[in-house]
């Protein structure tokens, strides 16, 4: 069985969680092979899950553009998001073909809406795993940057499109 795993490159925490999930799945089903789609470098996965994945260098998510670990560049984030959404149809078709040709039977996404879109296009079930989603991260910026409204709407659509939604603890949510 092959599982496609789309992982946001915004920090290694998501990749660490994804590696732990893949390792646990592989322990229960040793025949599973993962196709990892991300910009997180492959060396990050090689030590924890060696030999059970194929790496595909893919921009799966924008997150926030940061000048430093604590400084966010909102105008650059908006530009990057407007370039990323809506998804490029040619890119979606290419990823759909890859998943179908490799006989992927499931798409798992660690907060990456791209994987959900590809799963939907390929008619492959998708699972969203998250402890936060980008829509609510962007919401406080709407007042000064209304460009986020359409971006948030698009992200919420894909969150709702996932066949399964797993929210992990601790959950980061606005109250």
Q: Across the structure, where does each feature detected by a protein language model lie?
A:
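Conserved nucleotide-sugar phosphate-binding/catalytic loop shared by glycosyltransferases and other
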Residues: 32-86
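Structural motif
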Residues: 2, 105-106, 164
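Active-site-proximal region of nucleotide-activated glycan assembly enzymes
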Residues: 125-175
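Short N-terminal binding/cap micro-motifs at the start of the first secondary-structure element
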Residues: 12-16, 44-45
């Amino acid at each position: 069985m092959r599982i496609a795993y789309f992982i946001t490159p915004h920090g290694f925490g998501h990749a660490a969680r994804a590696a732990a999930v893949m390792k646990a799945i592989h322990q229960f089903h040793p025949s599973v092979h993962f196709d990892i789609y991300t910009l997180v470098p492959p060396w990050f996965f090689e030590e924890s899950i060696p030999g059970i994945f194929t790496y595909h260098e893919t921009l799966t998510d924008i997150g926030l553009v940061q000048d430093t670990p604590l400084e966010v560049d909102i105008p650059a984030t908006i530009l990057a998001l407007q370039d990323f959404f809506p998804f490029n149809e040619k890119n979606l078709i290419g990823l759909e073909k890859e998943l179908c040709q490799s006989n992927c039977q499931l798409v798992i996404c660690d907060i990456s809406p791209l994987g959900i879109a590809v799963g939907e296009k390929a008619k492959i079930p998708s699972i969203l795993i998250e402890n936060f989603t980008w829509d609510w991260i962007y919401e406080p910026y709407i007042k000064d940057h209304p460009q986020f409204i359409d971006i948030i709407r698009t992200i919420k659509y894909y969150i709702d499109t996932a066949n399964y939604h797993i929210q992990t603890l601790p959950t980061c949510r606005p109250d």
